C-alpha cells in the first residue's frame, strides 16, 4: 500500500509478529504496485470476473460504498490519471511499478461492480480500475486491530501512513494519546487527540509528492478534473478526521481536502465525525465535535 506501519500492543509480545504477518498479507493482496495482487488482477480484468481473497471482497465493498456515500468526492477510480501524472512507482520500493492499459477510464461510478461473496469473485465495469489508496490503509488498521483484540491483546494501536486505529486499553489512564502534527513544521503539534476506542486519520497534499519537468505534483486529485488539487489561500492543505473506524476517518479526510470546508464539513457533521482543517495560509477550522476529543 506504499506506506510504513507502526504497531503497539499491550499484551502478549508475540502478537506483534502476528500483526506483521497479517499486514504483509494485506499488502500482497491489495497493493497496486505488486503484479500478483488481487488489485492488479482486477485492474487488468477487462470486465471478466476475478477470483479474489475474502479480504479483497471486503475491501472492494468499502471502495464501492465510499464512492457512493460521498457522492464520488472520494473516488477510487482515479488511478489511470495518477499514473499518467507520474505516480506509477512505489515510494517505499522503487522496483515496484504500477502497470496499466492505456485505454482505461476514470471518474465513473462503481455501482455496476458485481461482488459475488459466495464464490469470492469481483467483476469490475469494463475500463475501470481500483486504487485502494488511503481507504486500504485505514481498513487494514481496523481489521488488524480487531483481530489482535480477538487474540487477547488488552490494547492495540496501529498506524499506517497517517491512519490510526486504537482499540482496548491505552497506556495513558486507559486511553490513547495521538498528536496531530502541523503540515508546515513536523515537530509542531497542532492538537492532541485522546481516544478510548476509535480512529484518527490525516490526509495532506504533502504526504506523497514528486517532480515532473521540475513541477511539484501530489497525490490528492480532483475527482472532476483528475488533476492534483491546486494550492491557494482557500485550499485546505491538511485534513484530520476522528471517528469510530480508520477506514471512514480516512475517506472523509479526503472528502474535506477535495470538497473544501462547506461541503466537506457538511458531510463530516452528517456522519457524526470530528475534523480539523488546515489551510495553505495557516488558518485552521474545527468542526463542532473536534473539541470533544482534543486538547
Please report, for each region that a protein language model flagged, where it lies by residue:
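Mature catalytic core of soluble alpha/beta enzymes
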Residues: 1-295
Amino acid at each position: 500500500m506504499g506506506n510504513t506501519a507502526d504497531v503497539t500492543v499491550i499484551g502478549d509480545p508475540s502478537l506483534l509478529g502476528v500483526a506483521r504477518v497479517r499486514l504483509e498479507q494485506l499488502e500482497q493482496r491489495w497493493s497496486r504496485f505488486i503484479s500478483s495482487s488481487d488489485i492488479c488482477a482486477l485492474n487488468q480484468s477487462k470486465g471478466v470476473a476475478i477470483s479474489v481473497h475474502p479480504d479483497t471482497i471486503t475491501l472492494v465493498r468499502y471502495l464501492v460504498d465510499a464512492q457512493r456515500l460521498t457522492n464520488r468526492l472520494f473516488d477510487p477510480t482515479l488511478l489511470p490519471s495518477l499514473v499518467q501524472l507520474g505516480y506509477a512507482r512505489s515510494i517505499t520500493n522503487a522496483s515496484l511499478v504500477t502497470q496499466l492499459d492505456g485505454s482505461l477510464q476514470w471518474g465513473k461510478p462503481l455501482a455496476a461492480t458485481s461482488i459475488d461473496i459466495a464464490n469470492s469473485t469481483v467483476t469490475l465495469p469494463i475500463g475501470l480500475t481500483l486504487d485502494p489508496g488511503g481507504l486500504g490503509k485505514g481498513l487494514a488498521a481496523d481489521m488488524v486491530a480487531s483481530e489482535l483484540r480477538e487474540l487477547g491483546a488488552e490494547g492495540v494501536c496501529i498506524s499506517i501512513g497517517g491512519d490510526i486505529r486504537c482499540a482496548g486499553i491505552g497506556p495513558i489512564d486507559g486511553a490513547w494519546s495521538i498528536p496531530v502534527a502541523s503540515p508546515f513544521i513536523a515537530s509542531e503539534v497542532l492538537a492532541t487527540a485522546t481516544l478510548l476506542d476509535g480512529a484518527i486519520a490525516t490526509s495532506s497534499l504533502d504526504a506523497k509528492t514528486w517532480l515532473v519537468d521540475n513541477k511539484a505534483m501530489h497525490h490528492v486529485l480532483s475527482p472532476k478534473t483528475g488533476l492534483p488539487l491546486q494550492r491557494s489561500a482557500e485550499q485546505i492543505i491538511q485534513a484530520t478526521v476522528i471517528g469510530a473506524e480508520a477506514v471512514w476517518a480516512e475517506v472523509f479526510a479526503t472528502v474535506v481536502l477535495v470538497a473544501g470546508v462547506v461541503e466537506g464539513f457538511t458531510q463530516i457533521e452528517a456522519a457524526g465525525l470530528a475534523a480539523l482543517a488546515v489551510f495553505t495560509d495557516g488558518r485552521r477550522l474545527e468542526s463542532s465535535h473536534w473539541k470533544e476529543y482534543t486538547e
